[in-house]
Amino acid sequence: MSEKNENVYDLSFFMPGKTIEAEEIKVPISKRFVDKKGNVIPFILKPITTERIDELEKENTTFKNVKGRGRVKDLDSQRFYARIAIESTIYPDFRSKDLREAYKTADPVEVAKRVLSVGGEYANWLNKAIEINGFEDDLEDLEEEAKN
């Protein structure tokens, strides 16, 4: 490889400590949660690691024996995405003891469903969590950013 090409393919950008830390983002999820001044209280979300996503996938996967096909992997995708959203949500912390006790359930996913009980609130929250974890990134948008 020529010296010129080595500069183009500089691997130092990918070395530990060189990446930009994933940032917390504030996202309005529902108009129903307001502070004393009437301002919408945003949720705070932060992407989780690929390793944690892999763990969540394993935790939400079962295997079934299907005649003629053998052992088939079955991912509970609704639960998987809900768990990603739970793990990505910094505030409100649906895993907190206070919220779990207040909503009388040990399951943080159920807490989220009860808190976000109106129409599209729960779906909106799931979509935002999936989006910040890169599942909704449009490949064309990423290619355009890479060009700039």
From Swiss-Prot:
Signal sequence range: none
InterPro entries: XkdN-like, XkdN-like_sf
Pfam families: Phage_TAC_5
Annotated family: To B.subtilis YqbN.
Protein name: Phage-like element PBSX protein XkdN
